Amino acid sequence: MLSPKKTKYRKQFKGRIHGTSKGGTLLNFGSYGLKAVEPERITARQIEAARRAITRQMKRQGRVWIRIFPDVPVTGKPAEVRMGKGKGAVDHWAARVAPGRIMFEIDGVPDDIAREALRLGAAKLPIRTRVVTRIDAGAALEAEAA
């Protein structure tokens, strides 16, 4: 599972995800991508489950790029512990994902397999998503320029 090797501080504030994604909104590597439509924290386990679903559907052909990384520590206190007495230990790691962020990219497989793989990967994530293609991105850029 993904997690940082080293961090400056062990624990962080919860934080909020405001607005749309500042970067990572265009396809950089593959021909197909999975784009977030709403803000959410996505755990390392969810990222791994989605990656496995995508890879399995592609029958290990082509290439998968994971464009998000779980760098936010999520803490939790044990069950049946009273309030107070400090913040809990780091339980797991999550990635903050804003709307518009490309989370996964794939290439090297036919159109129908690519779309189905990303649909199955999206089912493992707690947010609504859209499948985007390089053709969609090109048309959007041309429309912006005009």
UniProtKB/Swiss-Prot annotation:
One of its GO terms (cellular component) is cytosolic large ribosomal subunit. The keyword Protein biosynthesis does not apply. GO terms for molecular function: rRNA binding; structural constituent of ribosome; tRNA binding. InterPro entries: Ribosomal_uL16 (IPR047873), Ribosomal_uL16_bact-type (IPR000114), Ribosomal_uL16_CS (IPR020798), Ribosomal_uL16_dom (IPR016180), Ribosomal_uL16_sf (IPR036920). PROSITE patterns: RIBOSOMAL_L16_1 (PS00586), RIBOSOMAL_L16_2 (PS00701). Pfam families: Ribosomal_L16. One of its GO terms (biological process) is translation. Keywords: Ribonucleoprotein, Ribosomal protein, RNA-binding, rRNA-binding, tRNA-binding. Signal peptide: none annotated. Gene3D superfamilies: Ribosomal protein L10e/L16 (3.90.1170.10). It comes from the Bacteria. CDD domains: Ribosomal_L16_L10e. NCBIfam families: rplP_bact. Part of the 50S ribosomal subunit. HAMAP family: Ribosomal_uL16. Binds 23S rRNA and is also seen to make contacts with the A and possibly P site tRNAs. Belongs to the universal ribosomal protein uL16 family. This is Large ribosomal subunit protein uL16. The lineage of its organism: Bacteria, Pseudomonadati, Pseudomonadota, Alphaproteobacteria, Caulobacterales.
